[in-house]
Amino acid sequence: MKERKTFWDKNAGRYDRFMQKDRAAYEEMYKLIRPVVKAKTVLELATGTGLIAKHIVNAAAHIEATDASAEMVLEAKRDNQSAKLHFSVQDMFRLPYADQSYDVVIVSNALHIVPQPEKALQEIKRALKDDGVLIAPTFTHAENSIFGKVRAFFMKLAGFPLHSRWTSEEYLRFLRQNGWTVRKSAVLKASFPLTYAECEKTEV
């Protein structure tokens, strides 16, 4: 956790500007997410500055948006104007919520930057209702163009904590291998390929 907190705390103030380049992809993602969260209780992990939460909250019943970085959460709170949206600092590996608390869990662009992402998925599964939906869009860096690979190299030099490099196919397989049925997926065009995945718990 210390590695991620250090990097994200340091870059919290510039995060929104950094993400502007992917605005079109994110707008497309919001359109995919809104129908899924309509009138639902939602938990978002790795919310960052709350970009996704703020763009979908009008559709949801309530969103608890969390991040491991206190500085990111501070940035997220600055312009929050919705009573249905609450931000807090949480560890996605040790969530304080009861079993089956949420209709939808969103973890966007986070599983590739944490060690042992399969453990995060286990904790998500615990907090998600049995008939709930996991929304897990993730940059699939292994499909980078040459330009993307160069960009990723310099991001790594800057301290970006990339732990998993998946292709879209490898990422979806990873989700399935960890107990999820992928009911919908799409690859969105962004600075790095962005694989949108909508999942349900796999019946045992």
Which residues does each PLM region occupy?
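C-terminal alpha-helical "lid/dimerization" subdomain adjacent to the S-adenosyl-L-methionine
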Residues: 2, 18-22, 135-178, 183-193
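A short acidic, Gly/Pro-enriched loop at the edge of an enzyme's catalytic core
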Residues: 93-104
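Class I S-adenosylmethionine-dependent transferase superfamily signal
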Residues: 33, 56, 124
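Conserved class I S-adenosyl-L-methionine
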Residues: 1-37, 51, 75, 79, ...
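C-terminal lobe and adjacent flexible extensions of AdoMet/dcAdoMet transferase-like proteins
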Residues: 197-204
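A short glycine-rich, Lys/Arg-flanked "PGG" loop and its adjoining helix->strand segment in the class I
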Residues: 118-133
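Class I SAM-dependent methyltransferase SAM/SAH-binding core
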Residues: 43, 47-94
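A short SAM/SAH-binding and catalytic strip from SAM-dependent methyltransferases
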Residues: 104-116
